[in-house]
C-alpha cells in the first residue's frame, strides 16, 4: 500500500501540480474504489479494491484509477467537458513525466 500511496503522491505532483494526502478506508459504505476532491485528499477503499489490488504494485489499473480520480481536481462531473479535458491533460503530463524519467 505504501508503494501505491507514494506513487499517487508523485503522480499528483507531476500531473495536477498538487500535493495530496493519501488515506485508506475499508468500508462498504464508501462508494467506489477511491475518491478524490480538489481539497487534495485521495482515499483508497481497501474493501472495494481488495487486498490483491494493492499487492500487485503499480499496474495499469492503478494508473487508470489515479487518472480518473485526479480529474476531479478540475470537475466533479464525469460528463463535463472540464472533466474530459482534465483527463486528457493528466494523461499527456503522465506520458511526458514517464518519458523524461521523472516517474
Say what each PLM segment does.
Residues 1-41, 95-103:
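Auxiliary, metal-adjacent structural segments of Zn-dependent hydrolase domains
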Residues 23-63, 73-76, 81-95:
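Active-site scaffold of zinc-dependent metalloenzymes
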Residues 69:
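Walker B catalytic acidic pair
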Residues 66:
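Short acidic catalytic loops
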Amino acid at each position: 500500500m505504501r508503494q501505491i500511496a507514494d506513487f499517487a503522491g508523485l503522480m499528483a505532483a507531476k500531473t495536477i501540480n498538487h500535493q495530496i494526502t493519501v488515506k485508506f478506508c475499508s468500508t462498504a459504505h464508501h462508494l467506489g474504489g477511491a475518491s478524490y476532491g480538489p481539497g487534495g485528499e485521495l482515499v483508497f477503499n481497501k474493501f472495494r479494491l481488495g487486498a490483491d489490488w494493492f499487492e500487485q504494485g503499480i499496474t495499469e489499473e492503478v494508473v487508470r484509477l489515479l487518472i480518473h480520480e485526479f480529474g476531479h481536481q478540475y470537475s466533479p462531473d464525469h460528463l463535463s467537458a472540464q472533466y474530459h479535458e482534465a483527463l486528457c491533460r493528466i494523461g499527456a503530463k503522465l506520458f511526458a513525466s514517464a518519458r523524461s524519467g521523472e516517474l
